[in-house]
Design a protein with these regions (language model features):
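Class I (Rossmann-like) S-adenosyl-L-methionine-dependent methyltransferase catalytic domain
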Residues: 1-30, 45-77, 81-87, 130-185
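Conserved class I S-adenosyl-L-methionine
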Residues: 36-44
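Short catalytic micro-motifs in class I SAM-dependent methyltransferases
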Residues: 102-103
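Short amphipathic alpha-helix with an adjacent loop that forms part of the alpha/beta core around
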Residues: 87-93
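A conserved beta-strand element that flanks and buttresses the S-adenosyl-L-methionine
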Residues: 99
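A short glycine-rich, Lys/Arg-flanked "PGG" loop and its adjoining helix->strand segment in the class I
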Residues: 113-125
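Short glycine-centered segments of the SAM/dcSAM-binding site in methyltransferase folds
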Residues: 37, 127-128
């Protein structure tokens, strides 16, 4: 079976309402300004970064990493088609915010721990790493049967990883972002 490309391009994940809601939540978690440096791991098309860049009038183009090279990616970001560990290990840039969105479950446990460790060393003073993942216990994403099975496996993996992170890192805090998805037939 061929991989699903652009599956989310016209869904709620790409809607202005979702992006605005997410960025409002994000800006309550961390103080950013026009001089902030932002890295987004799993940026997709860069729509969240694009909106954030506009809101903050960023002087430094945010950097977005993704393993898919989307045709319709934002022009307001520096997009790199590369895996996160490779990029973060080599970059000399430090960041005020490192976002890891819906990607941590794609890594093996050791890779995820290594990525977080390297990311911590790439933060400016007062910088933050924010990991976005679905709540394994409270989500109601409508999916077809095979996708639902894979989603549940990913969510269980995320939950184990978050428990491991919280056990080993006293600086991590969990905050909940919720967004009500309205789907009509």
């Amino acid at each position: 079976m061929a991989p699903l490309k652009n599956w989310d391009n016209k869904t709620w994940l790409s809607s202005k309402k979702y992006i605005n809601s997410f960025n409002r939540f994000l800006l309550k978690q961390i103080k950013l300004n026009k001089n902030s440096r932002i890295l987004d791991i799993g940026c997709g098309r860069g729509k969240i970064l694009d909106d954030l860049s506009n809101k903050l009038k960023l002087l430094n183009k945010p950097i977005g990493l993704d393993i898919e090279n989307h045709k319709d990616k934002s022009k307001k970001i520096i997009f790199k088609k590369i895996d996160a560990l490779s990029y973060v290990s080599k970059t000399t840039i430090t960041f005020d915010l490192i976002l890891i969105k819906q990607t941590i479950h794609l890594l093996k446990k050791k890779q995820a721990i290594k990525l977080l460790s390297i990311c911590k060393n790439k933060l400016n003073p007062n910088g933050k790493i924010i990991i976005l993942s679905l709540d394994p216990n409270k989500n109601e994403i409508p999916t077809f049967q095979l996708m639902n099975k894979k989603l549940n496996i990913s969510l269980k993996k995320d939950e184990k990883l978050f428990n491991l992170i919280l056990k080993n890192q006293n600086k991590f805090v969990i905050k909940k972002f919720t967004f009500d998805v309205k789907i009509s037939k």
